[in-house]
From Swiss-Prot:
Subunit structure: Monomer. Binds 30S ribosomal subunits, but not 50S ribosomal subunits or 70S ribosomes.
The protein's role, per its UniProt record: One of several proteins that assist in the late maturation steps of the functional core of the 30S ribosomal subunit. Associates with free 30S ribosomal subunits (but not with 30S subunits that are part of 70S ribosomes or polysomes). Required for efficient processing of 16S rRNA. May interact with the 5'-terminal helix region of 16S rRNA.
One GO molecular-function entry: ribosomal small subunit binding
Highest rank taxon of the organism: Bacteria
Assigned GO CC terms: cytosol
HAMAP family: RbfA
Protein name as annotated: Ribosome-binding factor A
Transmembrane segments: none
GO terms (BP aspect): maturation of SSU-rRNA
Pfam families membership: RBFA
Family: Belongs to the RbfA family.
Protein's cellular compartments: Cytoplasm
Amino acid sequence: MKHRVGRVEQEIQREVNDILLKRVRDPRVEGVTITDINLSGDLQHVKVYYSILSNLASDAEKAQKGLDKAKGLIRSELGQRIKLYKIPEITFEQDGSVRYGEHIDELLRKLHQDEAQR
């Protein structure tokens, strides 16, 4: 069963990325990238983790509102593209790992600059 969940997660991630690029025309979701999918074991709920190009909090809030607004369209498109008994309920969450990685990179850069100045 675990293997099936992994395959369905991959398929959902690929399709949601495609739907966001080709079907959703909301300018608030431009620059949104799906980074991870977490599907429940019973295939009823899916958390979609995303990142955005901008670091502004207002852009993150706009992207979240745009994704919440497009949730119905995305779910209906998934229903047409994926053969499942029931299409899972979708929840969008911003992926903080990308921002955390950028923060670590910045700290390392500062450390290397300090060492070079000595």
